[in-house]
Amino acid sequence: MLRTDVLPWVEAAGDLGDDVLEIGPGPGLTTDLLRQRVDRLVAVEVDPSLASPLRERLAGTNVEVLCADATASGLWPDRFSAVTCFSMLHHMPSSELQERLFAEVHRVLRPGGIFVGIDSLDLDFIREGHVDDTFIPVDPGNLGARLEAAGLGDLQLDVGDYQFRFIARKPRG
């Protein structure tokens, strides 16, 4: 899935730039793909049991791993050329927190920067896989309006059989 779904979508987004933020890297599978394509990568993971081993594994590389809440990261405004999130939006405990995340993405993106993501659709088999886990699906039908409310626009959306992919941009001016 990473090489057939995620990587082509990231490459279709174009140049991610020199300073990229990955939100919710988990064990770092997508981090490994991204770090080979960008100069500098900051990965923000809220779960210490995932952030700590990822930080240790990637020590001395072009990746900085932070254990933090991505909805209030404390990172510099207008810093990142791109922000990514892969299969993590549905793990946010509420739609309100998803919207806070979108606002934080807007805050930390440079003008003209891109927000690239993939997430699961609301399907029975995906819900069954989250029985003991958070599953607050994002409706791709209203994603554009939610991103626009956060200040992001120029949405490109691709809805597949079990997931959707998106690219949005922070306006240049």
Residue ranges and their predicted role:
Residues S87-H91:
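Short catalytic micro-motifs in class I SAM-dependent methyltransferases
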Residues E99-P111:
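A short glycine-rich, Lys/Arg-flanked "PGG" loop and its adjoining helix->strand segment in the class I
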Residues F80, L97:
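Residue-level recognition of oxygen-bearing side chains
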Residues S73-D78:
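Short amphipathic alpha-helix with an adjacent loop that forms part of the alpha/beta core around
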Residues M1-N62, C67-A72, S95-E96, V116-G173:
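Class I (Rossmann-like) S-adenosyl-L-methionine-dependent methyltransferase catalytic domain
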Residues T84:
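A conserved beta-strand element that flanks and buttresses the S-adenosyl-L-methionine
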